[in-house]
């Protein structure tokens, strides 16, 4: 027996058999242990070969286990166990069979043949299960495909297509693929390339999420349905699993052997198999080690000769980075460009997928939800592509509704929490013996009984609604299964079965579904329903809001009233400046009502005016109004961008420079918070080149950062503030607004280029503040102090006379409202801080600030 000529797979089986014999306290290594090791190994192919030969494999396994259990046991056996005489005889027969077949190595399938030839106990088990020398020989010939075993790893290369590929056409027959809607031109172009004599390899190139893999699935469905030219009919479409090819390839050359096995199997198939390689750029460099070939180079000859019918898919960037660099590989593929579908096409795609998602989640998806998913994803999710991003919205909204359906409704949850609270209170009150506690106990018992009854009623309604909903979902699932069976029966030509399924089973299920839907509608009025069972446009809008931070939910009456009273709300923080507040309010109302140009920012303004008149404060008030938080204000001090090279800090350093990976300050902030107020403060202090990057933002609402990513500014309000022309505003005072603006604009035109001014929606001039304005600002600022004192359980009351003194002390026509803050600090906060530290005011007391001549006094 030539032990050195055993294949790696059979050597592994012998080692495993040795372990089994030791574990069973066997006296010898019997042939039965080797057979068990082969049958237990999923990758050995022994079980498949026996099944191919018509042997009852489960019977073999059962009888074999009984035989091994009956063998004599030797306790305390140490070291290796020697092969029994029967096993040595079987191994010798294997050697003879290998020589007869001209094999260089002895493969594990010859062990099965030798067992049948040898008339020992294990051989009898095989014969009783239906094994004969003739049918085992025939099965070996079928498995080998006419090839000899010429190297130790020959068994690993068998059935390479089964191990390293997935059959898409079989999945299409089983109804496991989603329907592919549209994309006819791309599928037709791919078929056209596949029918060429040479270089018949299409590569689908497009952005991530546009549906490249779906096109291949569509082709698989067409092949199964016979909707392809004659030359492609009955072909198999397999997906190459490159990860499985590479995984576990420990030794040099092992990966190449596996790939060669796949190529050999494809060559044997004589062009009846198409192979799809997703992310085809991963072939370039796959399996590459020092001096070894990579997968891309191994595929080139087969691709050029037309032996390998390959369909590739990759993104534009990766095609350029990997495939285009290798000109020899590139010329073997024919490009099929896959563009992003339009919103209308996406709606059609979603309607095609609607039923699959309804069955998966067990809920209904309405048509308005489908339209909203396509339109809102196109408008607000700008860094991804249709239809993928629209499908994601539908999937996530459906998942959310399903989660709500499977958990306790909010109304019941509130009652549950209240009951827990009351029971805890009852436990404490029961310990008390006074009359008040007894009365309280009666009230608690009464409330608990009422809530328990209400909870029981709601629980009954919820369970009934859930049962109806689950029943309808189950019927939908059965309908889908019947439809798949109808398609399979039609393909097999079994028209009798197809008509039975269609006119009996399907009609019966459709009636059941209609009845279930009627029961769902009649069970409770929509207002009283505890369960939400469908996805509408509002659910989609909620998901978009959560994903992007953009409030796109349908405008409620409260928000409409809020927008109509926007000036009033902003004037609570910004005193005077009626023209500025009106201009900003009009821009926001235009955008929120859907009348503004969707491809531009919500509004772009240039605020001009002297220091301290409320330019920056209006931006803060606007951010607070729109988002209930000033965190959505992106403030950039333009005095930091006085040098020409500082532009790179806004959009990110170009490739090759330090900080390239970090991105730009402005672009990164807007990517994270796409719905923001952008304040470019003191804009006239920036270098003129900074304005060049703003032109694109103001006109198209987008900006390309240093890494080539397009950042969307369409949901931002851009405000630039400047002190240009402030001397004219101070000299002319509060005269005719248009006259002041005309004079100031002359200075603006000298500083900014015409193309910059032309792109700004509105230039707003802020006028100086008068004594009354300062008095009103003092009231606003003192409210902030009142809130801080409230935290210390103190109240603040400022008399009108005291307010006049503060306003007078804080009034300066040149510096605006900023001196007022200093006046409040010196006149009120400083003396008050000393008094508080001295302990002059007890908690809950009121601090009154009154006038005492020209000074203030505290009481």
Curated annotation (Swiss-Prot):
Residues in coiled coil: 391-525
Binding site for ATP 2: 609-616
Binding of ATP 1, residues: 206-213
Keyword Repeat part of the UniProt annotation: yes
Region (Repeat 2): 83-146
Region (Repeat 1), start-end ranges: 6-71
Localization terms from the record: Cytoplasm
Protein's job: Part of a stress-induced multi-chaperone system, it is involved in the recovery of the cell from heat-induced damage, in cooperation with DnaK, DnaJ and GrpE. Acts before DnaK, in the processing of protein aggregates. Protein binding stimulates the ATPase activity; ATP hydrolysis unfolds the denatured protein aggregates, which probably helps expose new hydrophobic binding sites on the surface of ClpB-bound aggregates, contributing to the solubilization and refolding of denatured protein aggregates by DnaK.
Protein name stated in the entry: Chaperone protein ClpB
Organism of this sequence: Neisseria meningitidis serogroup B (strain ATCC BAA-335 / MC58)
């Amino acid at each position: 027996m030539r032990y050195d000529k055993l294949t790696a797979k059979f050597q592994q089986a012998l080692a495993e058999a040795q372990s089994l014999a030791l574990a069973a306290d066997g006296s010898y290594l019997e042939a039965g242990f080797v057979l068990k090791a082969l049958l237990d190994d999923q990758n050995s192919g022994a079980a498949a070969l026996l099944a191919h030969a018509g042997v009852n494999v489960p019977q073999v396994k059962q009888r074999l286990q009984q035989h091994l259990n009956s063998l004599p046991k030797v306790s305390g056996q140490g070291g290796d166990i020697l092969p029994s005489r029967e096993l040595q005889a079987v191994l010798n027969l294997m050697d003879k069979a290998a020589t007869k077949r001209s094999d260089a190595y002895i493969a594990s399938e010859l062990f099965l043949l030798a067992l049948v030839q040898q008339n020992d106990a294990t051989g009898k088990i095989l014969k009783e299960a239906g094994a004969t020398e003739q049918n085992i020989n025939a099965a070996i010939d079928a498995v080998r495909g006419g090839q000899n075993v010429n190297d130790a790893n020959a068994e690993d290369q068998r059935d390479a297509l089964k191990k390293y590929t997935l059959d898409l056409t079989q999945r299409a027959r089983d109804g496991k693929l989603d329907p592919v809607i549209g994309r006819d031109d791309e599928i037709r172009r791919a078929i056209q390339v596949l029918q060429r004599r040479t270089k018949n390899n299409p590569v689908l190139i497009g952005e991530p999420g546009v549906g490249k893999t779906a096109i291949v699935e569509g082709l698989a469905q067409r092949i199964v349905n016979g909707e392809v030219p004659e030359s492609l009919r009955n072909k198999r479409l397999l997906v190459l699993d490159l990860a499985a090819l590479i995984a576990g390839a420990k030794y040099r050359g092992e990966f190449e052997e596996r790939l060669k096995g796949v190529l050999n199997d494809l060559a044997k198939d004589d062009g009846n198999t198409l192979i799809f390689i997703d992310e085809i750029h991963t072939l370039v460099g796959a399996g590459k080690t020092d001096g070894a070939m990579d997968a891309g180079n191994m595929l080139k000859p087969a691709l050029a000769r037309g032996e390998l019918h390959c369909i590739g898919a990759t993104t534009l960037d990766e095609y350029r980075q990997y495939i285009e660099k290798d000109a020899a590989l590139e010329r073997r593929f024919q490009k099929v460009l896959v563009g992003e579908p339009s919103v209308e096409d996406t709606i059609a795609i979603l309607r095609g997928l609607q039923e699959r998602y309804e069955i998966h989640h067990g809920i209904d998806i309405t048509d308005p939800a489908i339209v909203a998913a396509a339109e809102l994803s196109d408008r607000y999710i700008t860094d991804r592509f249709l239809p993928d991003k629209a499908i994601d919205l539908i999937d996530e909204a459906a998942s959310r509704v399903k989660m709500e359906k499977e958990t306790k409704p909010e109304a019941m949850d509130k009652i549950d929490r209240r009951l827990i609270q009351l029971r805890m209170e009852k436990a404490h009150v029961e310990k008390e013996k006074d009359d008040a506690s007894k009365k309280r106990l009666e009230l608690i018992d009464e409330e608990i009984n009422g809530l328990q009854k209400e909870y029981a009623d709601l629980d009954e309604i919820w369970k009934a609604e859930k049962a109806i909903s689950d029943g309808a979902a189950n019927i939908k699932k059965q309908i889908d299964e019947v439809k798949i069976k109808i398609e399979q029966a039609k393909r097999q030509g079994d028209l009798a079965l197809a008509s039975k399924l269609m006119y009996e089973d399907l009609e019966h299920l459709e009636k059941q579904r209609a009845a279930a839907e009627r029961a769902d509608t009649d069970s409770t009025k929509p207002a009283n329903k505890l369960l939400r069972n469908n996805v509408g446009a509002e659910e989609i809008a909620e998901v978009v809001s959560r994903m992007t931070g953009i409030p796109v939910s349908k405008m409620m009456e409260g928000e409409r009233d809020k927008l109509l009273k926007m000036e009033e709300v902003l004037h609570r923080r910004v005193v005077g400046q009626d023209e500025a507040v009106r201009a900003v309010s009009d821009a926001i109302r235009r955008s929120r009502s859907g009348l503004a140009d969707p491809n531009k920012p919500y509004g772009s303004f240039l605020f001009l005016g002297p220091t301290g008149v409320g330019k920056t404060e209006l931006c803060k008030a606007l951010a607070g109004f729109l988002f209930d938080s000033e965190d959505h204000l992106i403030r950039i001090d333009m005095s930091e961008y006085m040098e020409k090279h500082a532009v790179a800090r806004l959009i990110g350093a170009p490739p090759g420079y330090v900080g390239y990976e970090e991105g730009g300050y402005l672009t990164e902030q807007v990517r994270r918070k796409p719905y923001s107020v952008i304040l470019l403060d003191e804009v006239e202090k920036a270098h003129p080149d900074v304005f060049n990057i703003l032109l694109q933002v103001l006109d198209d609402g987008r900006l390309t950062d240093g890494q080539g990513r397009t950042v969307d500014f369409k949901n931002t309000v851009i405000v630039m503030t400047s002190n240009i022309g402030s001397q004219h505003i101070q000299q002319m005072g509060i005269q005719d607004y248009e006259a002041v603006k005309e004079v100031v604009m002359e200075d603006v035109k000298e500083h900014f280029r015409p193309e910059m001014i032309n792109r700004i929606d509105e230039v707003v001039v802020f006028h100086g503040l008068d004594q009354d304005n300062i008095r009103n600002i003092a009231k606003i600022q003192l409210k902030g102090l009142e809130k801080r004192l409230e935290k210390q359980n103190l109240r603040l009351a400022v008399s009108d006379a005291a307010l006049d003194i503060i306003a007078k002390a804080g009034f300066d026509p040149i510096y605006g409202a900023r001196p007022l803050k200093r006046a409040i600090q010196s006149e009120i906060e400083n003396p008050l801080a000393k008094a508080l530290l001295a302990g002059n005011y007890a908690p809950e007391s009121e601090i009154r600030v009154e006038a005492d001549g020209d000074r203030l006094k505290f009481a």
